[in-house]
């Protein structure tokens, strides 16, 4: 072996040790940590930080679907956490999915985007605050003679706010009840709940779907673009399943 080849081979070995070995150590640490995290969940303790750590472990192990699933769960607790959102975006970038979101009017998209920074509980709280303020102002307008014009204007403002908040709140409730993530590799949505049924379209690991109904180990799902099909229940996991209710 020539000196130059020896130097090249040594450099490759050195780079491999520097780049891959820490990754392997991290994966080994994740293998040890995951059972402990899962045990905490089974004990009934849930938090955004716990789901975030679980997601990071799955991401390190290359299980992108389960990573996205747990980042979504973390965002139910800590929707404004920048680390969760950055890692969630990175996990999405590692999937094969294409954008299947149905097009919505710009105003609706903007409104939903704004309320993505609030948890479901926070959105419900804001909705009821606006609702009760609107009701209180309407009652005050009937009994208070002074400033009726101002009270009427404020009541209209809070009524409009209540209606506007109702739209993203409805979407959040829908997602909390039906949202699921594909956790297997590529799977096919089928026309009927049977493995030999006609394949309709592929679903990739990490894709978001909505579960419409279940039937003996199969789930009828709907993509965000409203295409529907049947897949095996083992290929997906509900974001807010029985053990992850918020």
Residue ranges and their predicted role:
Residues 147, 153-184, 191-194, 198, ...:
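Boundary regions of SH3-family modules and the immediately adjacent low-complexity/disordered segments
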Residues 198-215:
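Conserved beta-strand/loop element in small beta-rich adapter and peptidoglycan-binding domains
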């Amino acid at each position: 072996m020539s000196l130059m080849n020896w130097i090249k081979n040594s450099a490759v070995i050195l780079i491999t040790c520097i780049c891959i070995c820490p990754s392997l150590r991290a994966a080994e640490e994740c293998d040890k940590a995951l059972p402990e995290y899962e045990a905490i969940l089974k004990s009934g303790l849930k938090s955004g930080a716990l789901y975030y750590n679980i997601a990071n472990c799955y991401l390190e192990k290359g299980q992108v679907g389960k990573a996205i699933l747990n980042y979504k769960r973390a965002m139910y607790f800590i929707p404004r956490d920048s680390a969760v959102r950055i890692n969630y975006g990175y996990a999405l970038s590692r999937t094969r999915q294409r954008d299947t979101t149905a097009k919505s009017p710009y105003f609706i998209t903007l409104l939903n985007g704004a309320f993505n920074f609030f948890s479901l509980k926070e959105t419900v709280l804001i909705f009821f605050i606006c609702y009760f303020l609107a009701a209180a102002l309407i009652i005050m307008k009937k009994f208070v003679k002074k400033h009726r014009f101002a009270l009427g204007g404020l009541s209209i403002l809070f009524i409009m706010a209540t209606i506007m908040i109702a739209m993203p709140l409805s979407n959040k409730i829908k997602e909390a009840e039906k949202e699921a993530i594909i956790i297997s590799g590529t799977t096919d949505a089928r026309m009927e709940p049977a493995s030999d049924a006609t394949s309709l379209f592929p679903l990739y690991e990490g894709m978001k779907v909505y579960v419409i109904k279940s039937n003996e180990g199969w789930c009828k799902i709907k993509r965000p673009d409203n295409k529907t099909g049947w897949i095996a229940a083992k290929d997906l996991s509900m974001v807010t399943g029985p053990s992850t209710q918020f």
